[in-house]
Swiss-Prot record:
Its main location: mitochondrion. Pfam families: COX2, COX2_TM. Residues 46-59 are mitochondrial matrix. Belongs to the cytochrome c oxidase subunit 2 family. The chain crosses the membrane at residues 15-45, 60-87. This is Cytochrome c oxidase subunit 2. The gene is MT-CO2. Keywords: Copper, Electron transport, Magnesium, Membrane, Metal-binding, Mitochondrion, Mitochondrion inner membrane, Respiratory chain, Translocase, Transmembrane, Transmembrane helix, Transport. The keyword Transport applies. It comes from Microcebus tavaratra (Northern rufous mouse lemur). Its EC number is 7.1.1.9.
Amino acid sequence: MAHPAQLGFQDAASPIMEELMYFHDHTLMIVFLISSLVLYIISLMLTTELTHTSTMDAQEVETVWTILPAVILILIALPSLRILYMMDEITTPSLTLKTMGHQWYWSYEYTDYESLCFDSYMTPPLELDPGELRLLEVDNRVVLPTEMSIRMLISSEDVLHSWTVPSLGVKTDAIPGRLNQATLMTSRPGIYYGQCSEICGANHSFMPIVLELVPLKHFEEWLLSTL
């Protein structure tokens, strides 16, 4: 989870988030190189008199600055498209979890198990146990197995919401009347926090998300105790 004065991303806990971080670094390096080149040219223009005729009308220069931006855009677009397809592609999910946004809480339904559904409200600050996080804890956590492909079906009962868990690289809009899909897979057990990321009313800030990712054996034990 995030910590005070953090400048970078949260630690990646899913393959998709790892790819997103690599893509961020890749794009940032390209932006840094372009910015450095532009600043270098500006400094030359300010300190040097550019009066040579070849710099005023040069076919080669015009060709370069026409082709080079196209190449740079391709270098950015290709890995971006790859990640988009990774996020959207899911053929045989091990589990399907349906999420509905409400003002101002989330409801969850494990569609593979008929009777397993619950609402998840933020835990009021006065009811927190020692060690729990203010404005991030909920009364019912979502328990899921690790290292398994999980399909998220996300929608809303009232207004626009956005189901977001930064460590897992998941951010999907919850739109009334529309069912959006996301892929979820974690590489290690843990507790992961998220929040609604779409302004949805007065209590928008009080819609936390808590996922508890456990090994498959522990998930099966949780199912037996819950059903």
